[in-house]
């Protein structure tokens, strides 16, 4: 029964793995709900900042703020690449990196260089492995990242845009659609689009004029940074919700596969045991007949 013992050992091994994947599935489900709630709570702030900034930009057209310049010749681009710090989340990071690298290659074919800020160790390792120009990064952000962890890398990139050392900035991340679907997204963060500060931007429901202290221009300059930071944080929240959803689905699939493997191994074990019993009975019958 040496074969039978080996099969039982395999069954116990798969059962232990199944317990781990089941626990990871449950943890991911809990974390996904929390990240979804954080994502939902962050939206009203970002929308209100965008509305006030749009109102100020439309009433102060001669603002002279570099971050609001809309037309530039593109010579150098920046990327904010958001990925997860951990794996076991299906093809989530691979899909984002595929979209990101395709855009980088397209720019390189035009002779345009890139500068990259990475949030998440998976994206950072991928960029370093192929020799891309990573200028700043932040990893090990945890389940509830603080804005302070993002400010250093973001400030450096925004300052380079203000100095005309970078002419466009892309934001790349995994967008959360629903539990079963996450999609890689690439958005132009800078220059800020017409849908944010142009005629198609959201309008305030009130028609009266506002009085700003110290000045409308000072408030606008402050709000532009806060708006950009809120967009990046919202993308990070989306990416984290996508990560937990993808991990939950991946761990459920692994748990189900482990269950199927256990069933197959039990069937093989029962067949081998039945064959061994049949052989023993045949030997007993043959021995009795010989006597």
Curated annotation (Swiss-Prot):
GO process annotations (BP): proton motive force-driven ATP synthesis; proton motive force-driven plasma membrane ATP synthesis
One term of GO molecular function: ATP binding
UniProt KW keywords: ATP synthesis, Cell inner membrane, Cell membrane, CF(1), Hydrogen ion transport, Ion transport, Membrane, Transport
GO cellular component: plasma membrane; proton-transporting ATP synthase complex
Protein localization: Cell inner membrane
Superkingdom in the source lineage: Bacteria
Keyword Ribonucleoprotein: no
Family matches, as InterPro entries: ATP_synth_F1_ATPase_gsu, ATP_synth_F1_gsu, ATP_synth_F1_gsu_CS
Record Pfam families: ATP-synt (PF00231)
Topology relative to the membrane: Peripheral membrane protein
Main location, first listed in the record: membrane
Purpose of the protein: Produces ATP from ADP in the presence of a proton gradient across the membrane. The gamma chain is believed to be important in regulating ATPase activity and the flow of protons through the CF(0) complex.
Assembly description: F-type ATPases have 2 components, CF(1) - the catalytic core - and CF(0) - the membrane proton channel. CF(1) has five subunits: alpha(3), beta(3), gamma(1), delta(1), epsilon(1). CF(0) has three main subunits: a, b and c.
Similarity annotation: Belongs to the ATPase gamma chain family.
Protein name: ATP synthase gamma chain
Organism annotation: Neisseria meningitidis serogroup B (strain ATCC BAA-335 / MC58)
């Amino acid at each position: 029964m040496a074969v039978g013992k080996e099969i039982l050992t395999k069954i116990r091994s798969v059962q232990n793995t199944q317990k781990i994947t089941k626990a990871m599935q449950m943890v991911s489900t809990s974390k996904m709900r929390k990240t979804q709630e954080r994502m939902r709570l962050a939206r009203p702030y970002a929308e209100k900042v965008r509305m006030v900034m749009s109102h100020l930009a439309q009433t102060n057209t001669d603002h002279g703020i570099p971050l609001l310049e809309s037309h530039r010749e593109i010579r150098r681009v920046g990327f904010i690449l958001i990925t997860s710090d951990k794996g076991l989340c299906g093809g989530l990071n691979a899909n984002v990196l595929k979209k990101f690298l395709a855009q980088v290659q397209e720019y390189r074919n035009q002779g345009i260089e890139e500068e990259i800020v990475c949030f998440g160790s998976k994206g950072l390792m991928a960029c370093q492995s192929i020799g891309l120009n990573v200028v700043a990064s932040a990893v090990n952000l945890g389940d509830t990242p603080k804005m302070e962890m993002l400010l250093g890398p973001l400030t450096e990139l925004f300052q380079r845009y203000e100095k005309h050392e970078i002419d466009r900035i892309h934001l790349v991340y995994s967008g959360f659609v629903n539990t079963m679907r996450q999609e890689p997204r690439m958005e132009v963060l800078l220059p800020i689009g017409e849908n944010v500060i142009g005629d198609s931007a959201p309008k305030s429901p009130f028609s009266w004029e506002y009085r700003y202290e110290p000045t409308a221009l000072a408030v606008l300059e402050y709000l532009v940074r806060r708006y950009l930071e809120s967009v990046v944080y919202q993308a990070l929240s989306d990416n984290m919700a996508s990560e937990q959803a993808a991990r939950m689905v991946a761990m459920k699939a692994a748990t189900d596969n482990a269950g199927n493997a256990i069933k197959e191994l039990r069937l093989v074990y029962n067949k081998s045991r039945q064959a061994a019993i049949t052989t023993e009975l045949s030997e007993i019958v043959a021995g009795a007949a010989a006597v």
